[in-house]
C-alpha cells in the first residue's frame, strides 16, 4: 500500500540525475500548501550500487541554484520504495521499462519526470554522466522546466490519496 506523499525519482546509478531531481522536487514541494509541502521525496537507481557518492558536477550544478546535495549517497530501487510511493518518476523510457520488467506485479504509478509537459521536445532527460558541467546544467534546466507541470499533476494526485 502506498504511503501518501512519497515520491521516488529514478535514474540509472542514482548519482547524477535522480539526486538532482530529488532536490529540485523537494524544493518545489516546500513552496506548496499542505499536503504537498509535507510530502517526502527520495531517489534511487535501477542499476545503483548502495553508497556511491553523488557526481561532483551534479553537486556544482545544483549549488548554482542554491541547493546542496553533496551528502547524497546512492541506493538501488527496491520493491519497498516502489510500494511506498504514490509516484515513481523516471528520467527515461528505458528506466520505466526496466522497472516494469524487474518488478512483479508491475507497478502502475510509474511516470517520466517530464511526462506532463504538453509541448516538450523530449519527455526524457538524458544522462550527463562523465560529461562537462554544462551538460549537467542542461540536465538540471530540463528538470526545472518540468516542475510546473509536475506540480499540477501532483496536486491532482494529492486530491486522490487523501
Label the model's feature ranges.
Residues 4, 87, 93-162:
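Phosphate-binding/catalytic loops
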Residues 9, 89-90:
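Hydrophobic beta-strand core positions in alpha/beta domains
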Residues 18, 92-93:
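Helix N-cap/beta->alpha junction signal
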Residues 2-84, 152-161:
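Conserved active-site segments centered on acidic
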Amino acid at each position: 500500500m502506498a504511503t501518501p506523499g512519497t515520491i521516488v525519482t529514478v535514474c540509472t546509478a542514482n548519482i547524477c540525475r535522480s539526486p538532482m531531481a530529488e532536490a529540485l522536487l523537494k524544493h518545489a514541494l516546500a513552496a506548496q500548501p499542505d499536503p504537498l509541502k509535507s510530502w517526502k521525496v527520495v531517489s534511487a537507481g535501477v542499476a545503483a550500487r548502495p553508497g556511491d557518492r553523488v557526481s561532483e558536477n551534479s553537486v556544482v550544478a545544483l549549488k548554482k541554484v542554491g541547493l546542496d546535495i553533496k551528502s547524497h549517497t546512492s541506493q538501488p530501487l527496491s520493491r519497498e520504495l516502489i510500494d511506498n510511493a504514490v509516484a515513481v518518476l523516471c528520467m527515461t523510457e528505458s528506466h520505466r521499462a526496466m522497472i516494469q520488467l524487474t518488478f512483479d506485479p508491475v507497478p502502475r504509478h510509474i511516470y517520466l519526470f517530464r511526462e506532463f509537459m504538453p509541448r516538450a521536445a523530449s519527455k526524457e532527460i538524458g544522462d550527463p554522466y562523465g560529461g562537462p558541467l554544462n551538460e549537467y546544467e542542461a540536465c538540471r534546466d530540463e528538470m526545472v522546466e518540468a516542475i510546473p507541470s509536475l506540480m499540477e499533476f501532483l496536486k491532482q494526485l494529492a486530491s486522490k490519496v487523501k
